[in-house]
Amino acid sequence: MIYLDYSANTPADPQVLDRFCSVERRCIGNANSHHQAGTAARAEIDAATLKIAALLGVQPAEIIYTSGASESNNFALKGLARLSRHAGRHIISTPLEHSSVSGTLTALQEQGYEIDLLDIRRDGTVDLDHLKELLRPDTIAVAFTLVDSELGVVQPVEEIAAILKDYPNCHLHVDATQAVGKIPVSFEGVDTMSLTAHKFYGLNGIGLLLKRRNLALEPLIHGGESTTIYRSGTPTVALASSLACALELAVENLPERSASVQKRNAELRAALFQHPEVRINSPENAIPHILNLSVRDVKGTVFQRELDAHGVCVSVKSACSSDGLPSRAVFAVSRDRRNALSSWRISLSHLTTEAEIQEFLRVFDVCCQQLTAAHGDR
């Protein structure tokens, strides 16, 4: 099997697994308990929180542990909406968002909130002039993904944050799920930010919501203080510690890992450009970890299934998106519905080898000949 779907899930790093197992065996107490075992568990989770805070440049009190980015996005957007409901009910986002953002905004819209979506430029970035046009005194939030999961485009967070300084009632939420471990991530100028460990070689089931200390969101789970007043319950100490380990590895090894991925991406682009029926949808300014393409007149779902039959794992859209619909992200940059329906995504890792790329290209050639010939026969 050749795995080229690292944007959907990454394998846990062996050091992360070792950390989890070690802490799980050693810390048997409830971190909320006032005895030796509880104190030891509390010390472990406090150490993890301090490490995470240092790596992300935030204060420990700004860290909320969650089950993952979907929970973090829901928590942030619903919390900001409720917090600011007396100041306004207008929210701005983009058509590129993960379903945990777009779905939450749809739910808020049904509660009377007004949602506007930003125009997307042909390079995949948001139209900042359109943002300025949409902003109003009653705009309470702008929400966008830092790195698009389908195209790999990086949004200009610093410029967006600068624009919002003139709107004191407006908060900025950033979904950094696909960014951590791929590009440097800063919380500067941001009010809330979501991320999840399983995207940077950590374990499933643990994520973070970063929240400015001065924001008093309604608790996600009521019942008393745990690691924070915002999410009651017994903290999973080993998961928190494993996230800190994964984050440390991701930050420390970012330059080396990115260089490896850039090399694999260049090999792919050079080979795929030789196919006249292939259209590369990811712009040149996209991160190298994500390469989105379309094969003319062959639906992305069809090509993905054929590759899977040959032992190659790729994705059509985000793993959490609905099947059968064209990619919103690809349509936004190409304005071509057929092209969007034909699109699929290769996502790379520092673990991806040159041999895997060469084998993928061999399989791709076989699938491309079969599927384009089948279309031509109709």
Language-model region placement:
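Pyridoxal 5′-phosphate
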Residues: 1-378
